[in-house]
Amino acid sequence: MEPFRIHKGTAAVLMNDNIDTDQIIPKQYLKRIERTGFGKFLFDEWRYDNERHENPNFPLNAPDRKGASILITGDNFGCGSSREHAPWALADYGFRVIIAGGFADIFYMNCMKNGMLPIVMDKDMRENLTKTDAREQIEVDLENEVITTSTHRFHFTIEKMWKEKLLNGLDEISITMQYEQEIREYERKVAVY
């Protein structure tokens, strides 16, 4: 996993509350276990009409929001089923940071495990952040827990364990590999039957 320290990017705004994982990526696209290729299906039923033409009224389809890597959204983001495909779709689309009023617990952990930073921020702060010009680069500094725009600085908090994992680019496998020598020693000592 790539370490996450400072991210600079533009933001897309989708301030709906209770966006569930089926709205993030509908179930008909979950037939694969690779982590890539899901971005084109992100918010599929909102981004496209029945003939697969882009919906011009959907915020992510606005020309000045294309290429955004920060998503500012409502409360309870990622609720519903715990499909890991939802963070995969967000990451494959290009999002590195999701800022919401809150997240479903499993979705929150799945974001972290996939190298994305989910930030919990109150509504007033998010609304101030949405006023940032669509072309402005927003800086997200994980180490100092600060989001900076040209006019504001917003502080956020993150649990120390998750912060360290993201800063160091550690997933479960890389953490296990830190104990490779101890595992080998244990396996040598234990009898094989």
Swiss-Prot record:
Q: Which GO terms describe its cellular component?
A: 3-isopropylmalate dehydratase complex
Q: Does the keyword Chaperone apply?
A: no
The record's top EC class is lyase
InterPro entries on file: 3-IsopropMal_deHydase_ssu, Aconitase/3IPM_dehydase_swvl, AconitaseA/IPMdHydase_ssu_swvl, IPMI_Swivel, LeuD
Q: What does this protein do?
A: Catalyzes the isomerization between 2-isopropylmalate and 3-isopropylmalate, via the formation of 2-isopropylmaleate.
Q: Does the keyword Cytoplasm feature in the UniProt annotation?
A: no
Q: Which family does it belong to?
A: Belongs to the LeuD family. LeuD type 1 subfamily.
Q: Name one GO biological process term.
A: L-leucine biosynthetic process
Q: SUPFAM superfamilies attached here? A: LeuD/IlvD-like
Q: What is its EC number?
A: 4.2.1.33
Pathway, per record: Amino-acid biosynthesis; L-leucine biosynthesis; L-leucine from 3-methyl-2-oxobutanoate: step 2/4
Q: Which reaction(s) are listed as its catalytic activity?
A: (2R,3S)-3-isopropylmalate = (2S)-2-isopropylmalate
Task: State the oligomer form and interacting partners.
Answer: Heterodimer of LeuC and LeuD.
Which protein are we looking at?
Answer: 3-isopropylmalate dehydratase small subunit
> GO MF annotations for this entry?
3-isopropylmalate dehydratase activity
Alphabetized, the UniProt keywords read: Amino-acid biosynthesis, Branched-chain amino acid biosynthesis, Leucine biosynthesis, Lyase
Coiled-coil regions in this chain?
none
